[in-house]
Amino acid sequence: WVEPHAEGTTPMYEAMLRVRDMLSDWCSRSENRESFPPIVINITDGESSDCDDRELCDICSQIRRQSTADGNTLLLNIHISANNTIPSMVFPMAEELTVADHYARTLAECSSIMPDVFNSAICQMKGAGATPPFFGMGYNASIIELLSIINIGSRSVSNMQ
């Protein structure tokens, strides 16, 4: 749907506007009404250069509200940061975000809360002590963790039951 493009700044608001408009168009088509809802995987440095935090959270909320008869769009944010003083996080719980920097907390707020049907797979991946709700995001995830996010986030619900 979208060709990736990297160039200097991070116009995340503009990118999310385009995503919202594409999803709105796709979800409104009658042939897509009964489809599995869209999944958006945003890979970013987390430092939007064209809006403030509130504007970013608002546009992401609009994206998450795009829906089909089967549910709302799932927005997963993958935050790649130069700040390696914070441990990597995958599907973080709220308490894990207390050690995160401002950008990671903002992206968590922009992300979907993972639907209940995914909780068992996420708990199994995270291990002991993992309790929902989980934010649909990763922070400085390893390639294995990144693939786990994509794998869990893109499974159809029928494969989860």
Each model region followed by its residue ranges:
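Acidic, low-complexity intrinsically disordered regions
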Residues: 1-161
